[in-house]
């Protein structure tokens, strides 16, 4: 019995030696979980386990709300900066990281960014009227709605700064990528790039220079508004971008009759720059929706194509139960392994994520096909 058995084993081994080896494909650190992949690749889809970040009631600085996230991809992970509000009603930024784009692996125990002198101007409160502003509930001011852009080895952040009384301005800061991913929050001193005495929100920095200059997209209504500078150091506290306030007028007979502003930083494609934007419909008021447009690569003031339908609408419970109902507000988006991950705030209270096959989204926008977000049941 033993001899035939050895002969059989030897034969098998010989066969294995002569078989052709197929090299294994390296696994990506980011993978789409089967339970969230749509059978129809042209449809954006929410993560079924949304929200991915919720208020931490044991943490004084993020106990009330965690929302409006921005994101960058680096070191095989998605790095998220989100707005947080706690017991003092002061808005700060928190940090979280995800290896698969969905599950939060780590969440910072301390704020990643606090504008130390957010009361940045002496205010004559007796003679200066207080504006009626309560974006997300940060009654006592702070930092709001961050937008991250990674250029070379440096992370740039634009955000809205509110002094708690009458000034809502755009500020710019930056940090080395190495410090950022290691949670060493050595941010550069912030500098205001919007003028005093004006209200501005939703400004973003392009991820690369255009025609040799840095480009800041600071408005989409009444037209595309972009500021070009040779060096970001030109913003020294005396130079400001003069932006025309949104007119609110969108495309006639369309869902985006009231344009609000840009979402995440633009993403480069072969067709142009992908820009996600927030808008409302006069026929469906009080509901923030997300649309998409393509801007020309060399002249991004020119709109190449625009989605006929919103790619995201506030239809889920977590987008309607919170500080402000009917809100989906995206400040971050990354492309990984051919998938677009969109990070957004729901109801000004929680952080959520939705995905779509990147090429399918772009082709649908260019061909003007309706794009609709669905939730997998």
Q: Positions of the model-derived regions?
A:
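Polybasic, lysine-enriched low-complexity intrinsically disordered terminal tails
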Residues: 1-34
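Beta-rich carbohydrate-recognition and catalytic domains
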Residues: 27-68, 72-141, 150-204, 208-258, ...
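Short, exposed beta-strand/loop patches in secreted or surface proteins that constitute
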Residues: 148, 266, 333
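Short, conserved clusters of charged catalytic residues that mark active-site
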Residues: 261
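A conserved acidic, glycine/proline-rich C-terminal tail/linker
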Residues: 319-333
């Amino acid at each position: 019995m033993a001899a035939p058995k050895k002969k059989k084993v030897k034969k098998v081994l010989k066969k294995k030696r002569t078989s052709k080896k197929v090299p294994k494909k390296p696994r990506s650190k980011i993978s789409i979980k089967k339970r969230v992949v749509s059978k129809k690749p042209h449809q954006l889809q929410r993560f079924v386990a949304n929200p991915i970040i919720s208020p931490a009631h044991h943490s004084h600085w993020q106990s009330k709300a965690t929302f409006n996230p921005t994101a960058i991809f680096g070191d095989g992970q998605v790095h998220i900066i989100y707005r947080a509000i706690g017991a003092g009603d002061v808005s700060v930024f928190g940090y979280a990281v995800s290896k698969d784009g969905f599950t939060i692996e780590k969440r910072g125990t301390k704020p990643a960014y606090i504008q130390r002198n957010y009361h940045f101007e002496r205010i004559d409160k007796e003679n200066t009227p207080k504006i009626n502003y309560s974006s997300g509930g940060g009654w006592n001011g702070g930092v709001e709605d961050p937008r991250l852009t990674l250029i070379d080895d440096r992370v740039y952040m634009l955000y809205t700064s509110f002094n708690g009384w009458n000034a809502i301005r755009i500020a710019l800061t930056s940090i080395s990528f190495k410090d950022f991913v290691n949670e060493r929050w050595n941010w550069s001193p912030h500098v205001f790039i919007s003028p005093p005495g004006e209200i501005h929100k939703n400004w973003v920095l392009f991820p690369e220079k255009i025609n040799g200059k840095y480009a800041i997209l600071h408005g989409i209504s009444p037209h595309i508004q972009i500021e070009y500078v040779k060096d970001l150091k030109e913003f020294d506290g005396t130079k400001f971008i003069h932006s025309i306030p949104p007119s609110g007028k969108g495309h006639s007979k369309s869902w985006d009759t009231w344009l609000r502003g840009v979402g995440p930083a633009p993403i480069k494609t072969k067709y142009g720059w992908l820009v996600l934007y927030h808008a409302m419909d006069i026929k469906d008021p009080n509901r923030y929706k997300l649309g998409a447009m393509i801007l020309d690569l060399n002249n991004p003031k020119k709109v190449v194509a625009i989605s006929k339908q919103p790619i995201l609408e506030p239809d889920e419970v977590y987008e309607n139960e919170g500080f402000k109902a009917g809100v989906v507000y995206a400040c971050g988006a990354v492309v990984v392994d051919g998938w677009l991950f969109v990070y957004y705030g729901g109801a000004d209270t929680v952080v959520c994520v939705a995905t779509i096959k990147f090429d399918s989204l772009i082709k649908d926008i260019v061909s003007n096909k309706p794009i609709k977000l669905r939730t997998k049941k």
